[in-house]
């Protein structure tokens, strides 16, 4: 060493070189991740972890794997983080989010319960817990969690939306409409909000009013298949066969496979019969 510094032993030299290599792999991996070079980032992070365990790299690795659609591998990395930091609620929230993508609602619920234990005043895990319960066909429990979520965070629009959708599916149109109206007032003419309102109004037996709202949905998003399909059903019920045919034709143009098992190829039976058959097979509310 220069300037009178101590000469490193061969073992220390080796450790220093390994640390430099580790740091370089980690740095290159982060850089690659930020510019979208996922494959190279994965290689860097994997090689770095072979040299030394590092929680920050496990975190980065989970993010890259998630972007790649490698849900199981991403979950493994998050589990490693969760085991290392059992008091970190944010890790449990991320585990719940990935479990939702995997449709593993039992694991999702467990992560949410741990997160709410750690952060009882955080609305997010209650919302996620509601999604888990809904996935387990427990709408009553889901509504309870959503109510808790909006109690903690009064402007949590996604909780109002999911609660309204769940209430509507249960047949409680009055309560669903209350949430829908809150959303219209506080969120405005958002596609999902308008679609919800149209479904509520249709469920109340007001087809003309519902059609007018479906018109607004289509103005916001001209490719909203559900809006065309559901509006067409209402038009058919009102005797507007031409309008129903037009909407069903649009649905088939936007997504030909959606009705392939119902309508098939055009045949001599006539468009009216095909439209009736298609609409009778599809749940008009999409619930």
Give the ranges of each region predicted by the language model.
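Canonical tetratricopeptide repeat
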Residues: 60-61, 94, 128, 162, ...
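Short coil turns that delineate tetratricopeptide repeat
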Residues: 52-53, 86, 120, 154, ...
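Terminal, low-structured helical/coil segments at or just beyond the last alpha-helical repeat
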Residues: 2-10, 245-246, 253-287
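TPR/TPR-like (Sel1-like) alpha-helical repeat modules
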Residues: 185, 229, 233-260
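Helix-start (N-cap) detector for alpha-helical repeat units in TPR-like alpha-solenoids
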Residues: 22, 55-56, 89-90, 123-124, ...
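Structural signature of tandem alpha-helical TPR/SEL1-like repeats
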Residues: 36-40, 68-80, 102-114, 136-148, ...
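TPR-adjacent "capping" and linker segments in tetratricopeptide-repeat scaffold/adaptor proteins
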Residues: 2-24
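Alpha-helical segment of the N-proximal tetratricopeptide repeat
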Residues: 18-56, 60-67, 90, 94-103, ...
